[in-house]
Amino acid sequence: MNLSRFAPSPSSDSLISTLRPRAAVRRLHSNITGPMTPFKTAVNAYVASEGTDNSYVVRPRLYNDKRAQSDGSNALLSSIGPSGTTKRPRDEMDCFTDTHKHKRGDGNKSRRREQCRANQARYRDKQRNAQQQLERSVEQLQSELSTLKHRNLDLASRQRTNQSPWNTVAEVFRLLGVCFRSPWRVTCVQEMRNHSEMRQILAILERSFTHDVAMGDLRGIDALMEQLLQFSQY
């Protein structure tokens, strides 16, 4: 078996191109002391490639420029601590959560206030209705009491008017006769009240007259009975 065809053949001179060295990016430069941040490293690499006169140095393309600036910006933003003005995504999420909780708390407070107002309004209406019902009950009781008083007076008047007028006249003459026979019994009203016959006569006369009986300028049963007692003492 012939293996000569698999042997490597020499390359042509036309396939060899000029080698161009890459621009080295270092963290330390002659004019800058101390370590640099990724942002400064990317920017210095771009500046160094622009300022060289070597035509063999490959200058970065526009895409690489923007990418370097973007990488440097991201590195700068990532290096800012919590005290910086730029907020991290988690801080924004926390802020959004706090705002949502605050709004939800305000909504709950508003609903609670509305519920309290509704409860107070119902309580005031209930108290007002109870007060009005009590006032109506009092007015009804007063009306019934007045009606009962008038009915009582009417019944008493009917009972008195059922007696014969001659019986009343007879009781008056009977009173006068007792007074003439026993004048010491009419010395005072208290003495007259102590005598049983006098009490009976006075009770019959009081039942015979109405409560608004009148005789001359006298009005009422008590005034009339007092006048009769004075007549009996002459």
Curated annotation (Swiss-Prot):
<comment type="subunit">
    <text>Interacts with PKZ1.</text>
</comment>
<keyword id="KW-0804">Transcription</keyword>
<feature type="domain" description="bZIP">
    <location>
        <begin position="106"/>
        <end position="169"/>
    </location>
</feature>
<dbReference type="GO" id="GO:0120326">
    <property type="term" value="P:appressorium-mediated entry into host"/>
</dbReference>
<feature type="region of interest" description="Disordered">
    <location>
        <begin position="67"/>
        <end position="134"/>
    </location>
</feature>
<keyword id="KW-0805">Transcription regulation</keyword>
<dbReference type="GO" id="GO:0048870">
    <property type="term" value="P:cell motility"/>
</dbReference>
<dbReference type="GO" id="GO:0005634">
    <property type="term" value="C:nucleus"/>
</dbReference>
<protein>
    <recommendedName>
        <fullName>bZIP transcription factor 1</fullName>
    </recommendedName>
</protein>
<feature type="compositionally biased region" description="Basic and acidic residues">
    <location>
        <begin position="88"/>
        <end position="128"/>
    </location>
</feature>
<comment type="similarity">
    <text>Belongs to the bZIP family.</text>
</comment>
<keyword id="KW-0238">DNA-binding</keyword>
<comment type="function">
    <text>Required for normal zoospore movement, formation of appressoria by germinated zoospore cysts and plant infection.</text>
</comment>
<dbReference type="GO" id="GO:0075016">
    <property type="term" value="P:appressorium formation"/>
</dbReference>
<dbReference type="GO" id="GO:0003677">
    <property type="term" value="F:DNA binding"/>
</dbReference>
<keyword id="KW-0539">Nucleus</keyword>
<feature type="region of interest" description="Leucine-zipper">
    <location>
        <begin position="134"/>
        <end position="155"/>
    </location>
</feature>
<feature type="compositionally biased region" description="Polar residues">
    <location>
        <begin position="70"/>
        <end position="86"/>
    </location>
</feature>
<feature type="region of interest" description="Basic motif">
    <location>
        <begin position="109"/>
        <end position="128"/>
    </location>
</feature>
